[in-house]
Amino acid sequence: MFTFAILLLCVQGCLIQ
């Protein structure tokens, strides 16, 4: 579950960039 949250954060960062 914690890994999923980190993955979501990574995806959001990629979208922002």
Curated annotation (Swiss-Prot):
Domain of life: Eukaryota
Keyword annotations of the record: Repeat, Signal
Signal peptide: 1-17
Role summary: This protein is one of many from the eggshell of the silk moth.
Family: Belongs to the chorion protein family.
Record's protein name: Chorion class high-cysteine HCA protein 13
Organism: Bombyx mori (Silk moth)
Phylogenetic placement of the source organism: Eukaryota, Metazoa, Ecdysozoa, Arthropoda, Hexapoda
